[in-house]
Amino acid sequence: MERPFHHARTLCIAGVSATALLWAAAPAFAQDAQPAAAEPEATTVDEIVVTGFRSSLQQALNVKKREAGAVDAIFAEDIADFPDQNLAEAIQRLPGVTIDRENGQGRTISVRGLGADFTRVRINGLEAQAAYGGNRSRGFDFSMFASELFNSIKVRKTQSAEIEEGSLGATVDLQTGRPLDFKGAGFNSALSVQGSYNDLSEKTVPRVAGLLSWSNENKTFGVLASVAYSERAPISESFNTTRWQAGDPSLAYGAGNNFAGCIPCTTTAQRSEVLSAFYPRIPRYTFGTFNEDRLGLTTALQWRPSDRTEVVLDLMWSRFNVEAESPNIEAISFSRAAGGVRDTIVRDYAIDKDKNVISYGVFDKVDIRSENGFTRDESNFYQASLNLRHEFTDRLRGTAKIGANKSEARTPQSFSYMFDANDQNGFTYDFRGNDRLPMINYGFDVTSGSRFTLTERRKSTGGANFENSVFAGTMEYDYTPEFTIKAGGEYRTYGFDTFGYQQAASVLTGADRVVGVDALGKIVSIDGKLDIPTGSDLSYIVPDIWKINEFLSVFDDALVPTYNGFREVEETDKGIFVQADFNTELLGMTVRGNAGIRRAVTETTSKGYLNTDYVTVNNEYADTLPSFNLAIEPRDDLVIRFGAAKVMSRPALGDLTPGGSLSTPTRRVSYGNPLLKPFRATNFDVAAEWYFQNEGLLAAAVFYKDIESFITTVTETVPWKSLGLDDSLLAGTPASPDENFDVTRKVNGSGGTLHGLEIQYQQPFSFLPGFWSNFGFIGNYTYVESEVDYGSGRKGPLTNQSKNAFNTTLYYEVDRFQARVSAAYRSGYLLAFPGGNGNSEEGVNDTVNFDASMSYNISDSLTLSLEALNLSDEFNDRYVDVTDRVSNYRHTGREVAIGLRWKY
């Protein structure tokens, strides 16, 4: 859902940022007239020398122009110096790309309206999965890696036969540095040190990166190593409701989700008004404290014994750890039926008829809960790959690739405790002054533990493993200088497994159930940066986790396995392809491109617990995937593109589990679906690109995707024997394999369509006089519409698809100084359709993020930098229903980093 974009604060931030850029650039212009010192390494294009940020822009345009398909790229500005601190934040600058943020940093991307599960990511040519926390999908988590470890990113939006299958949206290539990439022989090195300050947490944390590379005099052998370490300590402040729900006026008071009574409801109309209006399930202010540390290492050995042969060994390791504490206080009984809202009495109320919500209420007999949780997540990623390239003759050459990677996600510690104060009177909330930040008062002194009882403890641990291995080879033969035949294949294995354990009993009894919890609690406060209305309780007692851990001897407690936490998928992907590349002249125009076909066979073995039985189901499917890409150059500065391809994306890993529940007496089954086929689509792309000057581009692209199958959840009556489950599961029961069962599961639905437009404009202002000629602009806009069938007659847009998105950057660069201000806008998008608890949908409202950076070259080797992220302290605003009821309204503050960078 899009909210109005004409915010005074947004315009103010944009104006101040642009003014600051001009102000900062003025001294640099003054020094521009002085004799210039030796310039850093440069990229030369048509006798014009550009460096730094402008050099990286020109490199990206060179790649975009020469590719046969639709490709956008980002390059490092210098050794171990990427344009953004976060990979996802960098990729979002490209047309068609939007990102999802968590705790103030980008984590996953969507390309042309298709989310992370539809996008493949390769690191040094090897498909990779980076898992963190609760991520159990195919989506890649970019927060795992420091951007300094990489020197380029390419986003391939059209498919060719030589690129492995598996993406409906895009294939993203991340490339780390290699020693023979540097111009000079001998040593090359870089070291950067930063301190980053968050204005919400008021903490300063370090960020350090270094690179050392060596090559021999003949540039035939080299070794490179890089390291990056960083910390973050953000705070998340928010208000959330955990959705809204409504009662039913056709039922009696105290039935269903109805309140027990309504004192001011003296008429049937008033009663109906209250019982049919939505109310927040768990209204609460909350904040989380996070401590993150990230460490990454890369190593590359590169050998070129001759011009015809190259061997590269790439090694990579990354670690990402997060500790989070999340204290909050809430009216928990609004989310319960029996023993909760059915006992609550409405003492006073007001209705917002536009949203159909109880916008203000005073309630008696409300259960108040104070809780606190601690989680430690640990993630590790390992990869090794060996790439071989050899030219057998001037016309015949080949490549081979072998490699493996593993991603481990662990939650070794996760525990939480609850203080409950039941049947409290006078609980009040009021949204009338602000529909995102209500006044909340609990009706008693919530800083005192006298009314609270320690009632529950929850402890769990779990994790997931993703393993991937690849062997691939390709041969190329130049039939003529204008025509090349390519053929090759891959054999890939993919493994995924999860596990989970939890405490057997969570409700405390006996001496552990403490009444009066002052000795076991601590006072926390929300400091008012949320502009919370007057009258709200901003300080409250919460469980002190470490005191209670000691009191309950929690680390001595045994854990039991959770059956639904154990599942596995073993996948084997085999592919072969043949492709013809052409580059010729036709009617005075350069015509180039490729045409090919790929055959892919997928075999899966899925395992999981159905009740307490461990079930194994095998599946196999095959796809024939033709593709065609054409680039026509009517002039040297103009490229017209056309692309068409059949594509596929494999089902989400969680959807393949045969685990779930089985009730033979009622003939009901609820599980994933290990027999799922992939998402399949036919893509069409048309684009025009005008490279009107050095570093200049004006481009437009339209795209259309006919999604032939889309995975949805349905409940249907089908024969047991059609499910692929073993008949032995029915042994000893009255049910037989020939009977029908009511089955809730994932199925391949009928699909839908997606279409859109991208516009891209980039230009240095070299046509302006003097000082102004050092400025430049980069901007892109993306429009996407989609409609897919979610089953049961429900049609709507794809989740994670924003209708409108744009990115802009205004930059200034001279020999020793550069600065830029960037904005990234994303319109609202869906998270779930339909939503839960009777809400029509769940989604995120539009956002706009502003960033700025500047740097000054003190010398040829030493650079001072200043970066500011999220200048407007943008809120992440989640909603439910088309009426835009608040679900989670969160912010994490601004970050400012100052640093020094040295290179040799």
Language-model region placement:
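N-terminal periplasmic "start-of-domain" segments of outer-membrane beta-barrel proteins
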Residues: 49-82, 108, 116, 126, ...
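Extracytoplasmic beta-strand/coil segments of soluble accessory domains associated
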Residues: 88-130, 157
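Outer-membrane beta-barrel translocator/receptor signature
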Residues: 132-139, 148-155, 162-265, 289-295, ...
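Transmembrane beta-strands of outer-membrane beta-barrel pores
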Residues: 157, 176, 195-199, 229-233, ...
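Outer-membrane beta-barrel transmembrane strands
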Residues: 176, 193-195, 204-215, 281-326, ...
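Flexible glycine-rich, low-complexity coil/linker segments exposed to the extracellular/periplasmic environment
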Residues: 250-280, 342-366, 427-455, 508-565, ...
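Gram-negative outer-membrane beta-barrel transporters
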Residues: 704-706, 723-833, 872
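C-terminal beta-signal and adjacent terminal beta-strands/loops
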Residues: 708-709, 825-834, 855-904
